Amino acid sequence: MNRVLYPGTFDPITKGHGDLVERASRLFDHVIIAVAASPKKNPLFPLEQRVALAREVTKHLPNVEVIGFSSLLAHFAKEQGANVFLRGLRAVSDFEYEFQLANMNRQLAPDVESLFLTPSERYSFISSTLVREIAALGGDITKFVHPVVADALTERFKK
């Protein structure tokens, strides 16, 4: 069984992330969205909420599972029986970091391959950082995130 692990902070999950998950769900038997705790990034949403939002966004995909984790990614992949890491590349500027990450992961988990997918053109410019900034300033984010995520961001910035 081919199990792909799609790791990220997903703070928040965007339509770009959703696009990659949809496509991965057609390519692999099982997709695990691995939501990283990432405390050093100081996420806007707590881990539990990011997991819940990702589950809501992907609930229509029967072969997709969402799990939060705070361990080393290579160890988590082994625990989950994943044989592929999925990473998205929006632009050439993403490649250098992703290349380094793939090589490090290969050293730590030699049995897990890294697979890079580019997003659909309509999502190639979306990033969680930009979505958070637009939401914080009261801008319309409905084109970039699922309605449940837009509601969560609106609620978060009301405070």
From Swiss-Prot:
It is found in: Cytoplasm. It catalyses: (R)-4'-phosphopantetheine + ATP + H(+) = 3'-dephospho-CoA + diphosphate. Its cofactor is Mg(2+). GO terms for cellular component: cytoplasm. It comes from the Bacteria. The keyword Cell inner membrane does not apply. Its EC number is 2.7.7.3. GO terms for molecular function: ATP binding; pantetheine-phosphate adenylyltransferase activity. ATP binds at T9, F10, H17, G88, L89, R90, E98, Y123, S124, F125, I126, S127, S128, T129. One of its GO terms (biological process) is coenzyme A biosynthetic process. The record marks H17 as: Transition state stabilizer. Substrate binds at T9, K41, L73, R87. Belongs to the bacterial CoaD family. Homohexamer. Reversibly transfers an adenylyl group from ATP to 4'-phosphopantetheine, yielding dephospho-CoA (dPCoA) and pyrophosphate. This is Phosphopantetheine adenylyltransferase. The gene is coaD.
